[in-house]
UniProtKB/Swiss-Prot annotation:
This protein is one of the two subunits of integration host factor, a specific DNA-binding protein that functions in genetic recombination as well as in transcriptional and translational control. It comes from Thioalkalivibrio sulfidiphilus (strain HL-EbGR7). Heterodimer of an alpha and a beta chain. This is Integration host factor subunit alpha. Belongs to the bacterial histone-like protein family. Gene3D superfamilies: IHF-like DNA-binding proteins. The keyword DNA-binding applies. Coiled coil: none annotated. Keywords: DNA recombination, DNA-binding, Transcription, Transcription regulation, Translation regulation. The keyword Transcription applies. GO terms for biological process: DNA recombination; positive regulation of metabolic process; regulation of DNA-templated transcription; regulation of translation. One of its GO terms (cellular component) is cytosol. GO terms for molecular function: DNA binding; structural constituent of chromatin. It comes from the Bacteria.
């Protein structure tokens, strides 16, 4: 099971009393702000949750799994996520509870 943007919108509708259109717009706006910050090369810090950062990966050798031929994997920029201590603790507590 996965949490979707629609699930988040539904939760805002139920918990905060926003209408469904407002809830959907709020979720979309949040993710658009995160996307735009990352596009500008900025780090995104969500207190109590974690950090999204950009990392440059160098070109490296790879292999075509079908042919075994060696091919270069081009340099690229990737988004990484590092969970914060509070999130780590909550996940560990949940996993430790046997649920």
């Amino acid at each position: 099971m996965a949490l979707t943007k629609a699930d988040m919108s539904e939760r805002l509708f139920e918990e905060l009393g926003l209408n469904k259109r407002e809830a959907k717009e709020l979720v979309e706006m949040f993710f658009e702000e995160v996307r735009m910050a990352l596009e500008r090369g900025e780090q995104v810090k969500l207190s109590g949750f974690g950090n999204f950062t950009l990392r440059d990966k160098n070109q490296r050798p790879g292999r075509n799994p079908k042919t075994g031929e060696e091919i270069p994997i081009s340099a690229r920029r990737v988004v990484t996520f590092r969970p914060g201590q509070k999130l780590k603790a909550r996940v560990e507590a949940y996993v430790g509870s046997g649920e």
